[in-house]
Amino acid sequence: MAREEQNIENRGSVHVVERESNLRSVVCGPVRWLKMLASKLHWSYVFAVVSNCGINQGFGYSLGHVATDYYMKDVQKVQPSQYQALSAITRISWIIFKPLFGILTDVLPIFGFHRRPYFILAGVIGVVSLLFISLQSNLHLYLALFWMTISSAAMAIADVTIDACTTYNSNKHPSLASDMQSLCSLSYSIGELLGFFMSGILVHLVGSKGVFGLLTFTFALVSVVGVLFSEPRVHGFSFKQNFTNAMKAMWRTIKCSDVWQPSLYMFITRALGLDIKEGLFYWFTDSKDGPLFAQETVGFILSIGSIGSILGVLLYNLRLKDHPFRKLFLWTQLLFALSGMFDLILVLRLNLKFGLPDYLFIVVDGIVSKMIIRLTWMVIFVLNTKLCPHGIEGTFFALLMSIDNAGLMTSSWLGGKMLHVLKVTRTEFGNLWLAVLVRNVMRLLPICFLFLVPQGDQNTFKLPAEIMGEDSEEEGTRNLELASLVDYVDRS
């Protein structure tokens, strides 16, 4: 009897130890993963990604997104179709400035440095542009749009600089390409979660213009990163020769069918996914037949949706990063189209007929949709890093992402045009359900172009050696490491 009681106690102790071990693995697993990346890629790369992708882009963009929505709706009083079209204009900076500064960071060092000055420049431009919006009263719509486009350009400059680091490391450590994109996306998603969570509260407390003023701190951080950035000084460079070599490498690469075909697919899949989110935003907040959400509620719902982004990153990193590109694009596109049915059910108010309140239904919709969108982005990012040759990583990755952003701009413009044709306005939403239905059907069309996507899996796919330019890689000029804070203080 005593032995049986002892066995029961031992089994109970084993279960307790197992639970503690599982809890420890949940907590320590991400820490070990970060340590692994820091040891193989240098801790400074991890710090750079968290600062730029997490704080400036994730937190800053999500906070600014909600502030811009209310600024356009309440301060500038624009129609949803007009706002949808105007939002496409701000994307122009990502199409023009990202490839432009991508090639400049590769071939034109400033004061002998390839990366530091561009981080500093991006931060200064972002701070100045947001200060103009936040401090000017009665700012004309198109002048406000101009400064928003400039701030978007500043974010694009910072983004292309960190992209160059990621792409270089992906070429140097191809087995870690998926992990690096997971780090970027996870940082962004966590920052996005915090930004959306605080957005509604801050807009309510200080107004949309006040939020623009607060966002200057995230751009100031970008300049700080530029000050701390350490890289070898370049001496005796030839801009003309570097530019000529970069153009030749780009032309040689873009002619490769393994490059232009997936690039075309990425543009098609973005352009055909009509963007009507501004029309839905007006319906959420202004329509008498809609939920009539307050500012705090909108921010909270968007923050809950960001949990879906984090789940998407975790799902990709744990289960999907070894699957073939074509298979992943197929399933993510199918799920992307199906997730749009949540919006259709909501606009038609079918959820109320099934006893599902708007709040609960939109939360579920946000989590599922964000998870699928993040999965799609992850696959696109990993594929883009695989398509970049050595020596012009920043240039070519920026070119590929500008193609992707051109697709998003086309999607936003076509979505605004559709809202205008269907007469969806600030007060009339009768045809919004039809716009949602058309958008969902259009999301299925890119599946017809899947033959453009390479069949290889994400770990083994690689461009030919003559395209990658592996023989001409210069490791000495690509040592992209951040100086430690201690070293910086010592130099000061």
Curated annotation (Swiss-Prot):
Record key words, sorted: Membrane, Transmembrane, Transmembrane helix, Transport
Residues that span the membrane, as ranges: 46-66, 92-112, 117-137, 142-162, 186-206, 210-230, 264-285, 298-318, 328-348, 361-381, 396-416, 433-453
Localization of this protein: Membrane
Family listed: Belongs to the major facilitator superfamily. Folate-biopterin transporter (TC 2.A.71) family.
Species assigned in the record: Arabidopsis thaliana (Mouse-ear cress)
Protein name stated in the entry: Probable folate-biopterin transporter 5
CC terms in the record's Gene Ontology section: membrane; plastid
Described purpose of this protein according to its UniProt entry: Could mediate folate transport.
Membrane topology, from the record: Multi-pass membrane protein
Phylogenetic classification of the source organism: Eukaryota, Viridiplantae, Streptophyta, Embryophyta, Tracheophyta
Signal peptide: none
Record keyword Transmembrane present: yes
SUPFAM superfamilies (UniProt xref): MFS general substrate transporter
Keyword Transport in annotation: yes
Gene3D superfamilies: MFS general substrate transporter like domains (1.20.1250.20)
